[in-house]
């Protein structure tokens, strides 16, 4: 091999293999197209390799992706790309969710702006409009997912209303009904007046509000009791519901009211007689110990009513207005009725007092209005039998939660589970596969109307004819299923279930890992485990990796309402996808931990993501440097270095590489992705770019020997540099896929139809591991760093050479420094390097210390001492001024109490740093005498 000169065409070609500067947009677009067109991520279920599968949490087709989606994507794609490099047959399956309530809410707002309702439009036309909106919005979301560099199989993309998934939903409903696990009944449900639909407990958000507690007087029927009691006093936060009261309850052990149990009261405003009952649910020590009972409008009262066989009087319509049972308040909106009821009670002398009261109010997560507990006939799933199977699996460690603390949260929810209301009074969604058998002349539905559950209308017709004869009319239930019903089938419905012969299902189910946020453990994770247990007999995933939230620089949760959300595409446009992905993953301190992402809204910039972009630039420049110094060779053509020819720096970087490989694999395998990113960053930036590249420069340009052959040491340096960079790019690929693919192709000269994404993880050569060498080399690095710092203090020009003295009493450290004299000379611009056991104090020197090493930099005749002394005094004065300000701030009691903890910590850190700077300046001044 011969060295290339700058004029050599091969040299020019090598230098031009990568552009001078990194263009993220062009690079990312090019590789995204290449991957997709080549089917790189479209696996064959018959292919070799251990199956590994992930189904992505399907984003709702309701707009644009947010930073939480970007974070989830970065984590999932890091995992699946790593597993693909491990030789596994990886399926990452994408898709979107129809988001029933969310989409219908958006569409009804659009219709309202057009002064029409969905009923004016009709169901068929409304659904046509919904599908058109889905195509537009869903297509936008898919494009955004592509921009994030997701290595998913787009050919297997699914949508929860696809025909295949719809068939799976109908099959699941029928089977659960056949098993007696789905039933229809009248129960108290959470009703959202805004969307006109029932919502599940999990779709209700509790909000703390400042309200009132109204104390009301309920007179005894027929006048005072024997002890003179004339009335009972109750308190409520919802006085409009008292119109539906059917009793007042007291605790049976409460001596104050025991004699009144069985007597009756007059319901204020309506004049109905209601009984005084005894129930253990009542807390006699809370308030007056008397509780109004409204079974049709309160879950606890509903239970009391069931126990005492009380009537259920609904006083509210489904639109939130009062109905005929509300008497003179009929037609009023519920909140207007509240005011009117309070005014009427006050007028009749039945309002005792009003107290301010802060309490939790249930809000519809989608409708954004307070929900009303209302009696309604709905479809329910019996959850206890489904949860029992999950409990059994969890006892055997399935699924495994990472971090483990979320297992308890999951188990507790399974234990405290209630039946799930799955019907929604909407049009967009999976229509419930149930048909009512009605009269040809009367299609009004009642609770007594018989119904049939079937997989299709034809099957329902057949059932109807078999049961009722030929002359029947069937009418499908108008309601749709809760979105989470179909989402609960996602891991296996997307792979072909209920077709048990599906190749995808056989190969990749159960899936390997679910990556999701803690906020949907109940909404989604538990529903999937219960559905999977019921229909496949196995848990749907081996591991559940729970990640935290993305918070802003003030540690606030990002949300639309807070106005602190960040559009990931803005940061991608500015810094590139890989920079954003790397920044998000690197910020993860531990599994399940929230991350912070700074963002300047005025300039649409982020220092965190910019740092990741700078890292990408660093890698780009390092690879270009290698290409210009490998003599037109590739890692493959250069081959492995001969261990006998390795220099100190070579052995050090190869030991670091072997350790990094081992550590990164262990961290990827254990979902410590943030740690893996930090390890690779430190290795690439510090070990390779800051040190090995600098140390290798003199060896990469040694000139030629008499025979014209490249010196053996130059060849070794090339081999090591090529190997280290090639392995690094593979290890970085899961985190920065586009950049690593581009650089890997440039470095290896691989054909365009060969992809880093499908390569094998580099083998770790454990024979290179050398703990003692790494420790020694760290001492060498620190010695060089001290010399550089002393040069900076002295104000020496970059080209100015000075002698350097190292003083140490440790023979092994002295030997290391002697061995590395050439490297020290090159990296510190040393005129000479002397290693001794005692100092030569005949000259004035600047001194530095690193462990057991003293470093002396003679400055007599080389530095303007007066100017240096002036700079040091100025530095000292600046540091002392900063110390005074920070110390005073910390001494202020108000600051310590009122300032956020992170601000106090930052102030303390700055004070410690200023004190260290002041002490260093004093030491330097002392050295000058």
UniProtKB/Swiss-Prot annotation:
Residue numbers of motif 'KMSKS' region?
Answer: 557-561
Coiled-coil ranges per UniProt: 862-929
Taken from the UniProt entry, a GO cellular component term is: cytosol
Record keywords, A-Z: Aminoacyl-tRNA synthetase, ATP-binding, Coiled coil, Cytoplasm, Ligase, Nucleotide-binding, Protein biosynthesis
* Enzyme Commission designation: 6.1.1.9
- Motif 'HIGH' region, which positions? 59-69
- The residues that the entry says bind ATP are 560
InterPro entries tied to this protein: aa-tRNA-synth_I_CS (IPR001412), aa-tRNA-synth_Ia (IPR002300), Anticodon_Ia_Val (IPR033705), M/V/L/I-tRNA-synth_anticd-bd (IPR013155), Rossmann-like_a/b/a_fold (IPR014729), tRNA-bd_arm (IPR010978), tRNAsynth_Ia_anticodon-bd (IPR009080), Val-tRNA_synth_C_sf (IPR037118)
- Protein's UniProt keywords contain Cytoplasm: yes
Chief subcellular location: cytoplasm
- Reactions listed under catalytic activity: tRNA(Val) + L-valine + ATP = L-valyl-tRNA(Val) + AMP + diphosphate
Q: Name one GO molecular function term.
A: ATP binding
Question: What's any GO biological process attached to this entry?
Answer: valyl-tRNA aminoacylation
Pfam families cross-referenced by the UniProt entry = Anticodon_1 (PF08264), tRNA-synt_1 (PF00133), Val_tRNA-synt_C (PF10458)
Q: Which SUPFAM superfamilies match?
A: Anticodon-binding domain of a subclass of class I aminoacyl-tRNA synthetases, Nucleotidylyl transferase, tRNA-binding arm, ValRS/IleRS/LeuRS editing domain
* Subcellular location per the Swiss-Prot or TrEMBL entry: Cytoplasm
Q: What does this protein do?
A: Catalyzes the attachment of valine to tRNA(Val). As ValRS can inadvertently accommodate and process structurally similar amino acids such as threonine, to avoid such errors, it has a 'posttransfer' editing activity that hydrolyzes mischarged Thr-tRNA(Val) in a tRNA-dependent manner.
Domain remarks in the Swiss-Prot or TrEMBL record = ValRS has two distinct active sites: one for aminoacylation and one for editing. The misactivated threonine is translocated from the active site to the editing site. The C-terminal coiled-coil domain is crucial for aminoacylation activity.
Family listed:
Belongs to the class-I aminoacyl-tRNA synthetase family. ValS type 1 subfamily.
Could you give the subunit structure recorded for this chain? Monomer.
HAMAP family (UniProt xref): Val_tRNA_synth_type1
Q: Protein name, please?
A: Valine--tRNA ligase
Name the source organism.
Prochlorococcus marinus (strain MIT 9313)
């Amino acid at each position: 091999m011969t060295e290339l000169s700058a004029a050599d065409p091969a040299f020019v070609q090598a230098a031009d293999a990568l552009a001078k500067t990194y263009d993220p947009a062009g690079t990312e677009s090019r590789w995204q197209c290449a991957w997709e067109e080549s089917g790189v991520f479209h696996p064959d279920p018959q292919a070799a390799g251990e199956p590994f599968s992930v189904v992505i949490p399907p984003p709702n087709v309701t707009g644009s992706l947010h930073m939480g989606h970007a974070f989830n994507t970065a984590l999932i794609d890091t995992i699946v790309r790593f597993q693909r490099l491990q030789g596994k047959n990886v399926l990452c399956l994408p898709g979107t969710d129809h988001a029933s309530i969310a989409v219908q809410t958006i569409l009804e707002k659009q219709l309202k702006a057009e002064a029409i309702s969905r009923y004016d439009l009709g169901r068929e036309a409304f659904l046509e409009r919904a599908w058109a909106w889905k195509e537009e919005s869903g297509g936008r979301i898919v494009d955004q997912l592509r921009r994030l560099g997701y290595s998913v199989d787009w050919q297997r993309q699914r949508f929860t209303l696809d025909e295949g998934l719809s068939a799976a939903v109908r099959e699941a409903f029928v089977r659960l009904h056949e098993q007696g696990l789905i039933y229809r009944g009248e129960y108290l449900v959470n009703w959202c007046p805004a969307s006109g639909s029932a919502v599940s407990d999990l779709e209700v958000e509790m909000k703390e509000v400042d309200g009132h507690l109204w104390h009301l007087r309920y007179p005894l029927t027929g006048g005072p009791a024997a002890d003179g009691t004339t009335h009972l006093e109750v308190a409520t936060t919802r006085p409009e519901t008292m119109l539906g009261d059917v009793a007042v309850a007291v605790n049976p052990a409460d001596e104050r009211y025991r004699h009144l149990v069985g007597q009756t009261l007059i319901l204020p405003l309506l004049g109905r007689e209601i009984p005084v009952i005894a129930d253990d649910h009542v807390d006699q020590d809370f308030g007056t110990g008397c509780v109004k009972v409204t079974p049709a409008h309160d879950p606890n009262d509903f239970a009391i009513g069931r126990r005492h066989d009380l009537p259920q009087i609904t006083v509210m319509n489904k639109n939130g207005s009062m109905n005929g049972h509300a008497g003179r308040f009929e037609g009023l909106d519920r909140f207007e009725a509240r005011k009117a009821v309070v005014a009427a009670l006050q007028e009749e002398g039945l309002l005792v007092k009003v107290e301010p009261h802060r309490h939790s109010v249930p809000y519809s997560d989608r409708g954004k209005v307070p929900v009303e507990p209302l009696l309604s006939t709905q479809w329910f799933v019996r959850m206890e039998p489904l949860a029992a199977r999950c409990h059994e699996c969890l006892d055997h460690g399935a699924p495994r939660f990472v971090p483990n603390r979320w297992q308890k949260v999951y188990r507790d929810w399974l234990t405290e589970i209630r039946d799930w209301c799955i019907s929604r009074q909407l049009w967009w969604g999976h229509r419930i596969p149930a048909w009512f058998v009605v009269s040809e002349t009367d299609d009004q539905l009642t609770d007594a109307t018989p119904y049939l559950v079937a997989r299709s209308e034809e099957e329902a017709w057949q059932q109807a004819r078999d049961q009722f004869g030929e002359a029947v009319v069937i009418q499908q239930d108008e309601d749709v299923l809760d979105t989470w019903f179909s989402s609960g089938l996602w891991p296996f419905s997307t792979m072909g279930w209920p077709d048990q012969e599906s190749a995808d299902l056989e190969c990749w189910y159960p899936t390997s890992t679910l990556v999701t946020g803690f906020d949907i453990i109940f909404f989604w994770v538990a529903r999937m485990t219960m559905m999977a247990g019921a229909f496949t007999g196995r848990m749907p995933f081996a591991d559940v990796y729970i990640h935290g939230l993305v918070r802003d620089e003030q540690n606030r949760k990002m949300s639309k309402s807070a106005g602190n959300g960040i559009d990931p595409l803005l940061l991608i446009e500015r810094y590139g996808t890989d920079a954003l992905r790397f920044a998000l993953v690197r910020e993860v301190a531990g599994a399940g931990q929230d991350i912070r992402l700074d963002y300047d809204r005025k300039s649409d910039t982020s220092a965190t993501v910019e740092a990741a972009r700078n890292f990408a630039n660093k890698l780009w420049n390092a690879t270009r440097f290698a290409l210009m110094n490998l003599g037109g060779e590739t890692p493959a053509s250069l081959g492995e270095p001969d261990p006998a020819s390795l220099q100190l720096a070579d052995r050090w970087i190869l030991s670091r590489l072997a350790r990094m490989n081992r550590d990164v694999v262990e961290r990827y395998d254990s979902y410590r992705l943030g740690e893996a990113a930090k390890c690779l960053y430190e290795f690439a930036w510090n070990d390779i770019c800051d040190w090995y590249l600098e140390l290798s420069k003199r060896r990469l340009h040694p000139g030629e020997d008499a025979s014209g052959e490249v010196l053996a040491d130059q060849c070794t340096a090339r081999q090591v540099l090529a190997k280290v960079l090639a392995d690094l790019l593979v290890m970085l690929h899961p985190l920065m896929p586009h950049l690593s693919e581009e650089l890997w192709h440039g470095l290896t000269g691989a054909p365009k139809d060969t992809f880093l994404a499908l390569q094998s993880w580099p083998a770790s050569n454990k024979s290179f591991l050398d703990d003692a060498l790494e420790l020694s080399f760290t001492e060498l690095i620190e010695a060089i760093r001290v010399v550089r710092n002393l040069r900076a203090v002295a104000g020496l020009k970059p080209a100015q050479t000075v002698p350097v003295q190292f003083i140490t009493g440790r023979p092994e450290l002295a030997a290391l420094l002697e061995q590395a004299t050439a490297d020290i000379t090159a990296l510190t611009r040393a005129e000479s390097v002397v290693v001794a056991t005692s100092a030569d104090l005949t000259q004035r020197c600047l001194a530095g210390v690193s462990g057991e090493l003293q470093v002396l930099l003679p400055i007599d005749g080389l530095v303007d001492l007066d100017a240096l002394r002036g700079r040091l005094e100025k530095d000292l004065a600046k540091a002392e001024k900063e110390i005074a300000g920070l110390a005073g701030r910390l001494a202020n009691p108000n600051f310590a109490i009122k300032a956020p903890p992170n601000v106090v910590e930052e102030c303390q850190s700055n004070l410690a740093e200023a004190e260290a700077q002041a002490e260093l300046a004093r030491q330097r001044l002392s050295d000058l005498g």
